[in-house]
Amino acid sequence: MNDFTLNAELRSDLGKGASRRLRRLAALVPAVVYGGDKAPESISMLAKEVAKLLENEAAYSHVIELNVGGTKQNVIIKALQRHPAKGHVMHADFVRVVAGQKLTAIVPVHFINEAAPVKKGGEISHVVAEIEVSCLPKDLPEFIEVDLANAEIGTIVHLSDIKAPKGVEFVALAHGDDKAVANVHAPRVAPEATEEGAAE
């Protein structure tokens, strides 16, 4: 049984006005499901069920069982549109998962052993919070682990420094973009402190 499930209903009343009415009057989130060998479907889901699902970070990078009017299909979250001030989900895009067919997904990054470079006097800057990956559905990781145990002051951790899980490829690297993920730098000194030190 899939731990990540959502119930939805097909909707025929489309357009921005219809979506606003769904959110305002029925506390529903409009969404679209596409991909695979089926036509796109416009659906709606209870806002409270969507919010509850997203309380678990793993839902963003996990195969979700979507029950649309009694028909179940496996999907992943492709995009979420949130309210700019309140943060709740206003619209969602889902992509169907096809067994044996590679998919791309956004996976959160987990940094571990951050205390090691801090003990050496360094400060850590996280450059990214998530990484786009390509893999088969069965290989989709819940997160990508970045180990900073051996990082020194001046270290820049790039995608190529991270060991990808078996069967997983970093999309940016495949396109020649070895982007920075994190860096360790010396503590920044306030201008006032620098001037006082020079005066002494």
Curated annotation (Swiss-Prot):
Recorded superkingdom: Bacteria
Keyword terms: Ribonucleoprotein, Ribosomal protein, RNA-binding, rRNA-binding
InterPro entries from the UniProt entry: Rbsml_bL25/Gln-tRNA_synth_N (IPR020056), Ribosomal_bL25/Gln-tRNA_synth (IPR011035), Ribosomal_bL25_b-dom (IPR020057), Ribosomal_bL25_C (IPR037121), Ribosomal_bL25_long (IPR001021), Ribosomal_L25_dom (IPR029751), Ribosomal_uL5_bac-type (IPR020930)
GO biological process, one term: translation
Pfam families linked: Ribosomal_L25p, Ribosomal_TL5_C
A cellular component term, taken from the record's GO annotations: cytosolic large ribosomal subunit
Keyword Transcription: no
GO molecular function, one term: 5S rRNA binding
Function: This is one of the proteins that binds to the 5S RNA in the ribosome where it forms part of the central protuberance.
Family affiliation: Belongs to the bacterial ribosomal protein bL25 family. CTC subfamily.
Quaternary structure and interacting proteins, as annotated: Part of the 50S ribosomal subunit; part of the 5S rRNA/L5/L18/L25 subcomplex. Contacts the 5S rRNA. Binds to the 5S rRNA independently of L5 and L18.
Record-given protein name: Large ribosomal subunit protein bL25
Species the sequence originates in: Pseudomonas fluorescens (strain Pf0-1)
Gene name of the encoded protein: rplY
